[in-house]
Amino acid sequence: MNIIKHLFGLLLISVLVSSCMSLGNAAQSTIVGGEYKADKNITEYFVLPYGEVSLPGKWEKWQYVSNARQQFFKNEDSVIIAIAFGPANKYEFNRNGLLKEYDFVKAYYDWESDYFVKLGYEAKIIETDQSNNYIIWRLWGQKYDTYFLFGERNGRVCNYSVHIADKWSEAEKIQFLKNIYLK
């Protein structure tokens, strides 16, 4: 029953994120791929031209939420993460593309967290890094607890999140997010 609540929470957050995120009408072709590389013990995932990431260990693609462009992954310990990439100028709050780097990341956090706080969730910034253009924050409530890293590089946005990770401490979740972003 507990896993059903977690799965429902994942679905709810994905739907809510996708309803908040408006990527505009102009279609952009992307190339999506990746694979597990046993010799390096990493799982690579990319959405070209928007971003790529190397995940430590073996991760299986689990679910994909197309309207949020969010790929979920699950590892052998049942830890669930999500990854989304996109252009910074396609977000509703940045249509003119004037927000860049850390200013964009802060506006993205404000926009996203405000939306969820209005729905009864709680949000807290855990760490900010203006020189590397990222914010790590936590969203929790209604039996749901997620850690996010929002980052921006050269007009490209990454949204990494750790959803179900009961076996990881808060410090491990934060370090995981930082490691995959800063590599």
Task: List PLM regions with ranges.
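N-terminal targeting sequences that direct proteins away from the cytosol to non-cytosolic compartments
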Residues: S18-S78, E122, Q142, S161-K183
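Enrichment for repetitive, rod-forming helical segments
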Residues: L12-I13, I81, I180
